[in-house]
């Protein structure tokens, strides 16, 4: 499965939007018409290469209501983002939640999430860790196709608020830990 990951992957605003894991975005804070144009442009670029998808993942994990509206208008059904233990529905899209911590994917917790891996910034030791986890816990993984077949639950205001607060708290903790470790608080 391939998800469209933005259009240019350039952060043009300092907004966190509805899921503020970061305070920078390609989409959050951008007018609807511009978002629709960028999402459509990215989709066209993929389709010109024979790649058809209705899955989207926002760069920086940041998006707003305009993003969700533009995604629907451009034919997307899924957004791989947000926090939760199983798919949920919001604004007519099915969210496939991401793990808030990679270790949570391998614990005895019930439910499903996606694990976001930025392989381009990993060293051999980190890659080895993932290889070991995949070998040791094969029962903890399902295919993306299977994940997409799990019906999304309707999520209301309380669930959306809890997710917003959790994303905000994680962003702040990552910044504090980064400051403590001397990397300027960008958590990377």
Question: Residue spans of the language-model regions?
Answer:
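Terminal accessory/targeting
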Residues: 1, 8-9, 13-14, 19-51, ...
């Amino acid at each position: 499965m391939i998800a469209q990951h933005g259009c240019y992957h350039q952060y043009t605003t300092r907004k966190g939007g509805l899921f503020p894991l970061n305070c920078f975005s390609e989409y959050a804070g951008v007018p609807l018409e511009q978002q629709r144009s960028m999402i459509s442009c990215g989709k066209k670029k993929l389709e010109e290469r024979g790649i058809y998808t209705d899955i989207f993942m926002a760069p920086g994990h940041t998006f707003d209501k305009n993003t969700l509206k533009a995604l629907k208008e451009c034919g997307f059904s899924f957004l791989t983002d947000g926090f939760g233990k199983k798919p949920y529905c919001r604004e007519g899209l099915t969210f496939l939640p991401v793990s808030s911590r990679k270790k949570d994917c391998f614990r005895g917790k019930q439910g499903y999430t996606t694990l976001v891996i930025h392989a381009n910034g990993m060293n051999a030791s980190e890659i080895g860790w993932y290889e070991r986890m995949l070998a040791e816990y094969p029962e903890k993984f399902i295919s993306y196709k299977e994940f997409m077949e799990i019906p999304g639950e309707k999520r209301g205001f309380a669930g959306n608020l809890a997710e917003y607060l959790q994303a905000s708290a994680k962003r702040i903790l990552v910044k504090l830990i980064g400051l403590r470790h001397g990397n300027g608080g960008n958590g990377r």
